[in-house]
């Protein structure tokens, strides 16, 4: 008799993305000035953006990839966390515990990482830290972009 594993549908949401880049100034113009995200650059090789009370939604780390290097998935509860972890390990996918420093940079209590089908790191967590300060409203989306000519400094043609 086969047992159907519990459904995790509706219990998983995108929590954050991790991007490796050396173009911090371009990202700041895009994230803060064009989109209106709150900008946090407290560490020299790390920048974080957020749109809400969560400490981090976009984590930029200095490096040559110029690409997304990880997706962070917020799970609604520990049962969902345990179920996904069980499924991944049952299929032989290697799992590693994130460090306390990595969790702090992402604004989460704890994370577990495993590779996705194309090698992109998938990170799961259950609790995101919320910021004690409201997102900066200084650069709301559209404030500088009402005149379409201002968008040229935010978006490049490739």
Model regions and ranges:
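Conserved short beta-strand elements that form part of the metal-binding/catalytic scaffold
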Residues: 36-69, 77, 120-128
């Amino acid at each position: 008799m086969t047992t159907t594993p519990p459904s995790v549908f509706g219990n998983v949401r995108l929590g954050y993305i991790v991007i490796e880049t050396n173009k911090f100034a371009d990202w700041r113009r895009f994230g803060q000035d064009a989109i209106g995200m709150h900008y946090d650059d407290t560490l020299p090789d790390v920048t974080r953006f957020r749109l809400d009370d969560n400490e981090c939604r976009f984590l930029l780390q200095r490096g040559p990839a110029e690409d997304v290097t990880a997706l962070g998935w917020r799970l609604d509860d520990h049962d969902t966390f345990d179920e996904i972890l069980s499924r991944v390990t049952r299929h032989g996918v290697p799992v590693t515990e994130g460090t306390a420093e990595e969790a702090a940079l992402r604004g989460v209590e704890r994370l577990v990482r495993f590779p996705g089908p194309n090698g992109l790191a998938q990170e799961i967590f259950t609790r995101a830290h919320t910021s004690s300060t409201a997102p900066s409203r200084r650069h709301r989306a559209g404030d500088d972009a009402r005149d379409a000519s201002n968008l040229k400094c935010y978006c490049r043609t490739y």
